[in-house]
Amino acid sequence: MATEQEFTRASRFSRDSSSVGYYSEEDNTEEEDEEEEEMEEIEEEEEEEEEEDPRIGLTCGGRRNGSSNNNKWMMLGRILDPRSKWVREWNKVFLLVCATGLFVDPLFLYTLSVSDTCMCLLVDGWLALTVTALRSMTDLLHLWNIWIQFKIARRWPYPGGDSDGDTNKGGGTRGSTRVAPPYVKKNGFFFDLFVILPLPQVVLWVVIPSLLKRGSVTLVVSVLLVTFLFQYLPKIYHSIRHLRRNATLSGYIFGTVWWGIALNMIAYFVAAHAAGACWYLLGVQRSAKCLKEQCENTIGCDLRMLSCKEPVYYGTTVMVLDRARLAWAQNHQARSVCLDINTNYTYGAYQWTIQLVSSESRLEKILFPIFWGLMTLSTFGNLESTTEWSEVVFNIIVLTSGLLLVTMLIGNIKVFLHATTSKKQAMHLKMRNIEWWMKKRHLPIGFRQRVRNYERQRWAAMRGVDECEMVQNLPEGLRRDIKYHLCLDLVRQVPLFQHMDDLVLENICDRVKSLIFTKGETIQKEGDAVQRMLFVVRGHLQSSQLLRDGVKSCCMLGPGNFSGDELLSWCLRRPFVERLPPSSSTLVTLETTEAFGLDAEDVKYVTQHFRYTFVNEKVKRSARYYSPGWRTWAAVAVQLAWRRYKHRLTLTSLSFIRPRRPLSRCASLGEDKLRLYAAILTSPKPNPDDFDDY
């Protein structure tokens, strides 16, 4: 007999295996490994808890009461289901928050600039305040996400749980009480906390001003760049990890192909933005190095003059009284060498930054490096580098990253566009093959046009999706539920099915097939074997019967009507005859028609297994009322009865009047009478016993 632990593991395995349909083979390998490791750790912890606390036992339904160690995490509030709609929507929002954070962090590198007036390094105060505020807003949203992660159950809820994500109703279950410990022990909490540490803010507002006051202008750039990369690179991994986890959990991110293309373009734009910001900061460092060399060659110049008197500049004008600073600000030699665009100083790849480091336009300082990043990542070259090792390494990293990013961008967009246009291309290829075949077989123009119209109508209805094949590949229970959901409302529109119970309707929905007919299509000819029953959903059909002397009896079938009722008589007749019954009418579409088809074998199955349903008097009356054969017979019978009545009245009136030509008059009346009786006798009357034997 299976133990309690084995039963719990088996039930958990069945729940986990039911979610495989959400995953893809390429994206979920690492996530599945992580989930397996997490589940193993949880099982080990549960075994330890069982050994330590033997009081833990099963409650009703095989669920356990939570221990005191787990109850402290219940104080966080309502436990959230990771697959609930609210959590999935928040994951999408948080993905955009991560992208915003990746765009905001490089803005810290633009806060350093060179004063064109005093030729000193400073921090743009207003830009620093703006970037700090934006970073604080994204950090608050990250903190909110950490709080949500504490409340999300690390184990999926039971299938009968609440759809709103509340898995903590009716007492703590074994799967729902384990919430926060795996999130903490898997280092997810510490990693989420690391990416929101205020390292750039501390460096910008504390470290950099102190370094500027000491005159370490080149060290300032190095400290800011190292701090930025130290947190930015893990932040990129954090965003990618969240993206893949979200895709693994729900199977898609935003549900459309264009969102996938947009995410790839955003990632490429953010990469260009980060590369341009680093390029700008290294350009500031090259300018500071040039100014430092000029200061060392100038008599009376102190390195502290390379940093402004106020390290954080807010745009206020301050009177400079220091003569040494005034002399340095008026040094035209240093200005022409370091800050002039036509300088002979070897800036290398940072040549274009000369016009930016001393610019007062913040928009230009941000947009131009983004343009440089997009251009460099897209062209893989056009960089004039010096022999300095740091510049060479930077150029190598930028070019290699650009090659990888462009390759990934083109590949992903190609995949997304192929997913969008593959069906259309398959349709065009199929139409070319059909045109070639029709031309080879010399089909008439009318046939060709009918084939084209049918293919267009089928494409317009389903956009190339083979619904029958798609549903047939699903498990039997899921297939029946889906077809019952899709077809029930339409099947109930057929009056014949309105008085049947749900079991019969479920079997009918499981066997009906969706059919589309173009205008002017002959569906069935009179005298052919009836292959299926047709239930009109949209459009109109013309049902015609050929009487004697070339006379036709026609009626129109609209939504709610059906044809092929001969199959009902054939299935319920005793003894049963294997030969299919002949059709009593010809069906022609008057417009594009959508209908449900129930094949003869399916009708036979339904009538044999649910014979009691057709004994119902309401079903009998509905079948007779909506049957084209019964309607035609009833119309002819009423019409002939009326004509006989009118003929009787005519004969009665003629008995009081002397006719001028009594013989010819009587002869014509006799012919009419015989013609009427011949019509009623030769009209196809349905077998009255067909529905009495049900």
Swiss-Prot record:
PROSITE patterns xrefs: CNMP_BINDING_3
Compositionally biased residues, Basic and acidic residues: 1-15
Ranges in the topological domain labelled Cytoplasmic: 1-92, 148-187, 238-251, 414-694
Region described as Calmodulin-binding: spans on this chain: 610-626
Extracellular side: 114-126, 209-216, 273-392
A GO term, aspect molecular function: cGMP binding
Any one GO CC term of the record: membrane
Positions that bind a nucleoside 3',5'-cyclic phosphate: 496-626
Entry membrane topology: Multi-pass membrane protein
Function comment: Acts as a cyclic nucleotide-gated ion channel. Permeable to potassium and sodium in a cyclic nucleotide-dependent fashion (cAMP or cGMP). Might constitute a common downstream component of the signaling pathways leading to hypersensitive response (HR).
Record-stated family: Belongs to the cyclic nucleotide-gated cation channel (TC 1.A.1.5) family.
Name of the molecule in the record: Cyclic nucleotide-gated ion channel 4
Organism for this UniProt entry: Arabidopsis thaliana
Gene giving rise to this polypeptide: CNGC4
